[in-house]
């Protein structure tokens, strides 16, 4: 939005356009790098920390000595003496009640972080560029639905305000009071132990007022909740991107807005108020890739497109896939049908033969006359349905074994010799 409109309207204290226009500073077209903003914010935020440490004597203000081995107890130092519960209890160790912590904290920790100056300036440029895009500002939670324009620039007369009621009236005329009402609605008690440490209440962030000279503007705006006041010569990334997230709603005075080109320069001219500083440039000046690829310079270097398309055909087994077989051999369908019909015809013939044989056998068995003595017996039938003669018929059951005739023993009379 800001990049498409090079002129910015200046609004009066009544919330109407004053008729004056300001050229959009080049810093609002700088690349937006959330990664750099977050990195710089994280490191600069660490510089506000206050060193802390536990007492060097904590956990060691008792007399204790290890009992050594052979007592069937741990070798941790134990309090000496007797007559009290404390005697014999473990001491000093971090696993003991009343002992010191593991690796007691020291005040000589590396609390501060150094950040490159150019990197800090890059982060501020990114935060300023993001503050001119309504989508990013609204995604941060600012209520700017009725704000006439972004970036929002007002006349320098605002820098001379000394009363809060004048500041409130200005915000209402600029339709920015909805953002303050959001702050009022968000005021609540902090969760956690910060309540005990003089950080009881928390609230959302409101607009950031950026001015050039303080002629009373600080006193006018400082009592409105959520408002942050910044001098354009001392912009702070911690205020322009709270939490390391770009998209703060900023209200500029005219003189502060015009001073941005001198502070950060343009791509044609270096910054006059900073030594050896040039505005960061985009890695791609034109992000329309389709336009770049279709440009004659690129097309001239490319080879001609290959019109012929080679598609890989999935090979299927025609013996298993009928559709593929019919593609290769259309007569296969007729052959398969003829085979099925032939099999059905053969099956019918086989069934008829079996029925005829069974009928013939039944008629034969009815014509046979039974012999004498064999009226009660059923005719013996062979394997193929033929009758067996009585002579050839084998007796059923166990085989009869022929026994030898028993020899007679000679009597006593026979034993006597003849006289």
Swiss-Prot record:
Component of the large ribosomal subunit. May bind IPO9 with low affinity. Interacts with RBM3. The modification Citrulline is found at residue 300. It comes from the Eukaryota. PANTHER family: 60S RIBOSOMAL PROTEIN L4 (PTHR19431). Keywords: Acetylation, Citrullination, Cytoplasm, Isopeptide bond, Methylation, Phosphoprotein, Ribonucleoprotein, Ribosomal protein, Ubl conjugation. GO terms for cellular component: cytoplasm; cytosol; cytosolic large ribosomal subunit; nuclear body; nucleolus; postsynapse; presynapse; ribonucleoprotein complex. One of its GO terms (biological process) is cytoplasmic translation. Belongs to the universal ribosomal protein uL4 family. This is Large ribosomal subunit protein uL4. Citrullinated by PADI4. Residues 393-402 have a biased composition (Basic residues). Pfam families: Ribos_L4_asso_C, Ribosomal_L4. The modification Phosphothreonine is found at residue 266. GO terms for molecular function: structural constituent of ribosome. Residues 364-419 are annotated as: Disordered. Component of the large ribosomal subunit. The ribosome is a large ribonucleoprotein complex responsible for the synthesis of proteins in the cell.
């Amino acid at each position: 939005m800001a990049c498409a409109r090079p002129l910015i309207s200046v609004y009066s204290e009544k919330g109407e356009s004053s008729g004056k226009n300001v050229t959009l500073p080049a810093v609002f077209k700088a690349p937006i790098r959330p990664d750099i903003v977050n990195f710089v914010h994280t490191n600069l935020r660490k510089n506000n920390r206050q060193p802390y440490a536990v007492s060097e004597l904590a956990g060691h203000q008792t007399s204790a000595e290890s009992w050594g081995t052979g007592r069937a107890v741990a070798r941790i130092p134990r309090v000496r003496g007797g007559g009290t519960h404390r005697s014999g209890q473990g001491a000093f160790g971090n696993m003991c009640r009343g002992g010191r912590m593991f690796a007691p904290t020291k005040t000589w920790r590396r609390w501060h972080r150094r950040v490159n100056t150019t990197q800090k300036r890059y982060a501020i440029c990114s935060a300023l560029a993001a503050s001119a895009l309504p989508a990013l500002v609204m995604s941060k939670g600012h209520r700017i639905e009725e704000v006439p324009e972004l970036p929002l620039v007002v006349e320098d007369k605002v820098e001379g305000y000394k009363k809060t009621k004048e500041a409130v009236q200005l915000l209402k005329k600029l339709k920015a009071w909805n953002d303050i009402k959001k702050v009022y609605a968000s005021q609540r008690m902090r969760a956690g132990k910060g309540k005990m440490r003089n950080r009881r209440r928390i609230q959302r962030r409101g607009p950031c007022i950026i001015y050039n000279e303080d002629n009373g503007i600080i006193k006018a705006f400082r009592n409105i909740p959520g408002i942050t006041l910044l001098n354009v010569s001392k912009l702070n990334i911690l205020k322009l991107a709270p939490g390391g997230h770009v998209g703060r709603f900023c209200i500029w005075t005219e003189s502060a807005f015009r001073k941005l080109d001198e502070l950060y320069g343009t791509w044609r001219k270096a910054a006059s108020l900073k030594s050896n500083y040039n505005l960061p440039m985009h890695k791609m000046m034109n992000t329309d890739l389709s336009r770049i690829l279709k440009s004659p310079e690129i097309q001239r270097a490319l080879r001609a497109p290959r019109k012929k398309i080679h598609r890989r055909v999935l090979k299927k087994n025609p013996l298993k896939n009928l559709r593929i077989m019919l593609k290769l051999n259309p007569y296969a369908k007729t052959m398969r049908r003829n085979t099925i019909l032939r099999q059905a015809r053969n099956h019918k013939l086989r069934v008829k033969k079996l029925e005829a044989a069974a009928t013939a056998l039944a008629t034969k068995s009815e014509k046979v006359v039974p012999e004498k003595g064999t009226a009660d017996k059923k005719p013996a039938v062979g394997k193929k349905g033929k009758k067996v003669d009585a002579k050839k018929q084998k007796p059923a059951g166990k085989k009869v074994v022929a026994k030898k005739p028993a020899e007679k023993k000679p009597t006593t009379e026979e034993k006597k010799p003849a006289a």
